[in-house]
Structure formats: C-alpha cells, structure tokens
Curated annotation (Swiss-Prot):
It holds the Pfam family PP-binding. The lineage of its organism: Bacteria, Bacillati, Actinomycetota, Actinomycetes, Kitasatosporales. GO terms for biological process: antibiotic biosynthetic process; lipid A biosynthetic process. Residues 4-82 form the Carrier domain. 4'-phosphopantetheine is transferred from CoA to a specific serine of the apo-ACP-like protein. This is Actinorhodin polyketide synthase acyl carrier protein. Disulfide bonds: none annotated. One of its GO terms (cellular component) is cytosol. One of its GO terms (molecular function) is acyl carrier activity. Acyl carrier protein. The keyword Methyltransferase does not apply. The modification O-(pantetheine 4'-phosphoryl)serine is found at residue 42.
Length: 86
C-alpha cells in the first residue's frame, strides 16, 4: 500500500508552497481552519495540490482540488486517491 499523507507532511507542503503568512501558526491544530482564514489563496492551494500529486504519484483534477476548503479536506482527498491507487 502507498504511504499515506500525514498531517506533518501536509503542513510542510503548505509552508513550502505558500510560506509562513503574517501571524499564521500552522504548528497547532490547523486541519479544520479554512484556507482563506490562514491566508492561502487559490493559487497557493493549487500549487500545494500539484506538489502533493507529484510527490505521492496521484492525480487530482484541478476542479476537484480547487473546491477543498480546509487542510483536512485536502488531506482526505490525497489519501483517498492513494487508497484508490493501491
């Protein structure tokens, strides 16, 4: 079975793609925060999704990736694709 995306891996990818934003702390429980509330725009979200697709060898349509509202939804989307590919 393919390695699942962990919360720590997702946090690293979010920081790599969008950087630390003013006052945004991703060290705590960030999974249910809305992307817009932590300063991530649609471009940063699409870049993060593309990076995770490449890193984990899955394919997520842009229109699907663009509809996620929280990091938890993105985590579930990637891990669902990994489970389907297994």
């Amino acid at each position: 079975m393919a390695t699942l995306l962990t919360t720590d891996d997702l946090r690293r990818a979010l920081v790599e793609c969008a950087g630390e934003t003013d006052g945004t702390d991703l060290s705590g429980d960030f999974l249910d925060l809305r992307f817009e509330d932590i300063g991530y725009d649609s471009l940063a979200l699409m870049e993060t999704a593309a990076r995770l697709e490449s890193r984990y060898g899955v394919s997520i349509p842009d229109d699907v990736a663009g509809r996620v509202d929280t990091p938890r939804e993105l985590l579930d989307l990637i891990n669902g694709a990994l489970a389907e590919a297994a």
